[in-house]
Amino acid sequence: MPQLNPTPWFPIMMLSWLIFSLIIQPKLLLFTPTNPPSNKTTTTTRSNPWTWPWT
């Protein structure tokens, strides 16, 4: 079965990871989000208990 022979597939996998690591990843790390996170105060919501008619 030629699928089990790792000789042609291993260099292809290593080359693709090398391309990802050296070319694509630095470009992705330079990306700055359009909306930076802000420090907002959390508001607590108040819930009213429900009165069940059968209790």
Swiss-Prot record:
This is ATP synthase F(0) complex subunit 8. Residues 35-55 are annotated as: Disordered. InterPro entries: ATP8_metazoa (IPR001421), ATPase_protein_8 (IPR050635). Belongs to the ATPase protein 8 family. The lineage of its organism: Eukaryota, Metazoa, Chordata, Craniata, Vertebrata. Signal peptide: none annotated. Component of the ATP synthase complex composed at least of ATP5F1A/subunit alpha, ATP5F1B/subunit beta, ATP5MC1/subunit c (homooctomer), MT-ATP6/subunit a, MT-ATP8/subunit 8, ATP5ME/subunit e, ATP5MF/subunit f, ATP5MG/subunit g, ATP5MK/subunit k, ATP5MJ/subunit j, ATP5F1C/subunit gamma, ATP5F1D/subunit delta, ATP5F1E/subunit epsilon, ATP5PF/subunit F6, ATP5PB/subunit b, ATP5PD/subunit d, ATP5PO/subunit OSCP. Pfam families: ATP-synt_8. The keyword Membrane applies. GO terms for molecular function: proton transmembrane transporter activity.
